[in-house]
C-alpha cells in the first residue's frame, strides 16, 4: 500500500511539473543561435505559449488557472525589468530578440509562470487546504514588505531573513 501511495505521489508531482519540465527542456535544448532563423529568446516564447495553449486545450489547466499563471508571468517580467535596469544591472539578456521590452525578452516571465503553474497544479492535484491561515491583512502586509525588500534592498539593506522569520512565526 505504501508503494502504491508513493507511486501516486510521484505521478501527481510529475503531472504538476509538466509545464516546468517542458519549458526548461526547451531552455536547455534550443541552441543559442535559435531555431529556423528565429532568435533563441523568441523561440523560447513560442514554445512557452504553445505549451500553455496545449495545456488549456487538453484540459490540463483551466482558464482560471491560466489567469493566475498570467499574473505570475506579469509580475515576474516586471521583476526582470527591474533587475536588468541600468541602475541595477544584476544580469542582462545580451542576445537579440524581436520580443524584447525594456531589454528583457518576454519569455523570461514564463520562468516565473512555470513556478506558478507548478503551485497551482500541485494545489489542485493534491487537494491542498490551508488551515489556520493568518488574517488576510497580515498576509497582504508581509507580501508587500517582501516585494518592497526585493526592490529596496540595494538602497536600505536586506531584510529578507527578518521577513522570513515574520512569515514563519506564530
List where the protein language model places each region:
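Aromatic-rich, lipid-facing transmembrane alpha helices and their immediate juxtamembrane interface loops
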Residues: 1-170
Amino acid at each position: 500500500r505504501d508503494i502504491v501511495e508513493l507511486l501516486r505521489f510521484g505521478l501527481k508531482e510529475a503531472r504538476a511539473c509538466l509545464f516546468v519540465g517542458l519549458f526548461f527542456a526547451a531552455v536547455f535544448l534550443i541552441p543559442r543561435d535559435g531555431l529556423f532563423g528565429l532568435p533563441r529568446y523568441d523561440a523560447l516564447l513560442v514554445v512557452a505559449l504553445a505549451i500553455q495553449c496545449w495545456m488549456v486545450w487538453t484540459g490540463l489547466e483551466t482558464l482560471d488557472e491560466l489567469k493566475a499563471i498570467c499574473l505570475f508571468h506579469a509580475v515576474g517580467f516586471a521583476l526582470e525589468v527591474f533587475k536588468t535596469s541600468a541602475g541595477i544591472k544584476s544580469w542582462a539578456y545580451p542576445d537579440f530578440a524581436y520580443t524584447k521590452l525594456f531589454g528583457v525578452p518576454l519569455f523570461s516571465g514564463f520562468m516565473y509562470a512555470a513556478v506558478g503553474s507548478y503551485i497551482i497544479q500541485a494545489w489542485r492535484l493534491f487537494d491542498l487546504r490551508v488551515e489556520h491561515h493568518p488574517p488576510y491583512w497580515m498576509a497582504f502586509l508581509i507580501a508587500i514588505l517582501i516585494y518592497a525588500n526585493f526592490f529596496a534592498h540595494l538602497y536600505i539593506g536586506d531584510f529578507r531573513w527578518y521577513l522570513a522569520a515574520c512569515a514563519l512565526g506564530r
